A protein has these predicted regions:
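Cytochrome P450 core scaffold surrounding the K-helix E-X-X-R motif
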Residues: 225-229, 332-338
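Segments forming glycine/polar-rich beta-alpha architectures that bind adenosine-containing cofactors
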Residues: 199, 205-206
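Conserved catalytic alpha/beta cores of large enzymes that bind or transform nucleotide phosphates
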Residues: 214-306, 311-315, 344-357
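Short beta->alpha transition motifs characteristic of CBS
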Residues: 219, 324-332
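N-terminal beta-alpha lobe that positions the nucleotide/phosphoryl donor
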Residues: 1-187, 198, 278-285, 290-302, ...
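Conserved, single-site charged/polar hotspot
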Residues: 193-195
Length: 357
């Protein structure tokens, strides 16, 4: 690997929590989890150095700064959206320098060979340096692309992730919270796409009541896109944190599944066969495995967490589940002044927080 690739590409195996400035919090934490012995996807990160190099080579910093200064009211949605579209267009038409482009393509080829799949499906996930911190929840404000195959599509998806740093939601959020645009670089994770039988999110505390002795799991067949889009309600599970005893298990009518279409090379929505619509997505053994993993992550960081998990379609009893993201739990802390009796709405949660970039 040449010098430029060393600057632009870092493998998950070489990351930990000290690499957030290089890899963003999302992918850096995956490296830390792997060092804990927790199963995470294979992959690499296109570093913040690569982002800065792309911005500088296209003289984007000054142009973006000038456009951001035109926003006079962060609450004016039309104004923010107009500027956002202009900035994202600037980024999406800008050329990625050849050496950076080659580094991304070569690393994808190396990952494909490592995973024994010459046209490996990947998850291209934004990983901003200020994302998912305990005091500023960026969850769901940046883009993720599932099922990306081929070197050229991968490069294009990386550029789209960079552009998502300037969505209207992200722009407005930074302006309202006095966060710098110039000091918020975007890294991008390129991760092997797990062949999901089911996927979901798990909390180490109850996200509505704040109860520290209850863990909550939400999930659906396949990937989480159908939940994000609000077309399916996930199963809801509550477990005692101390004894891992199943306390509540609500099985939803899951009519839609997000599945990978190998012919199209993308994740698509399909109708779920009637046999599986009202079937539980997880066995008790899988529920316990997820909860023990989440508890280990909470113990590591010493604060409540929410975790995105995937059960591989080839998983056998006793195997680990795959963790694709972890972050500080912010739902309850952001809503702690609201009534704890509010009814938990899994679709509203997922649309706002889970399964997103």
């Amino acid at each position: 690997m040449n010098t430029s690739e060393n600057r632009f590409i870092v493998w998950v195996d070489d990351l930990d929590d000290n690499a957030i400035s290089i890899a963003g919090s999302k992918v850096a934490r995956l490296g830390e989890l792997r060092k804990m012995g927790i199963k995470v996807p294979d992959g690499f990160v296109v570093s913040t150095d690569a982002f800065y190099m792309f911005m500088k080579s296209n003289d984007l910093e000054k142009q973006i700064s000038q456009k951001v200064q035109l926003i006079t009211d962060a609450n004016d949605l039309d104004q923010v959206e107009t500027i956002s579209e202009e900035i994202r267009h600037l980024i999406e038409i800008s050329e990625i320098p050849d050496d950076l482009c080659d580094a991304i393509k070569n690393s994808y080829q190396e990952l494909s060979f490592k995973c024994s799949d010459i046209n490996l499906p990947t998850a291209v996930r934004s990983s901003a340096t200020g994302e998912d911190s305990a005091d500023s929840s960026f969850a769901g404000q940046f883009d993720t692309y599932l099922g990306v195959t081929g070197r050229q599509r991968l490069v294009e998806s990386v550029r789209k992730c960079w552009a998502s740093l300037f969505t209207s939601r992200a722009l407005s959020y930074r302006l309202k919270n006095n966060l710098s645009h110039e000091n918020s670089p975007m890294a991008v994770g390129i991760l092997q796409l797990v062949h999901a039988r089911v996927s979901g999110v798990a909390f180490s505390i109850h996200p509505v009541t704040g109860s520290k002795d209850r863990m909550v799991i939400e999930g659906n067949w396949g990937w989480g896109e159908a939940v994000v889009q609000g077309v399916v309600t996930p199963d809801h599970i509550e477990v005692g944190k101390t004894d891992m005893r199943l306390l509540e298990h609500q099985i939803a009518d899951k009519q839609i599944v997000s599945a990978f279409d190998y012919a199209e090379g993308m994740v698509i929505e399909r109708k779920m066969p009637k046999l599986f619509r009202e079937a539980p997505i997880l066995t008790e053994e899988e529920i316990t495995t997820i909860c023990k993993t989440v508890k280990a992550i909470e113990d590591k960081y010493n604060y409540p967490v929410d975790v995105e998990w995937v059960v591989d379609k080839n998983r056998r009893e006793g195997d680990p589940v795959t963790i694709v993201q972890t972050r500080p739990e912010t739902v309850h802390s952001n809503e702690e002044n609201e009534s704890a009796s509010n009814k938990w709405d899994p679709v509203a949660y997922a649309t706002k927080y889970a399964f997103k970039g």
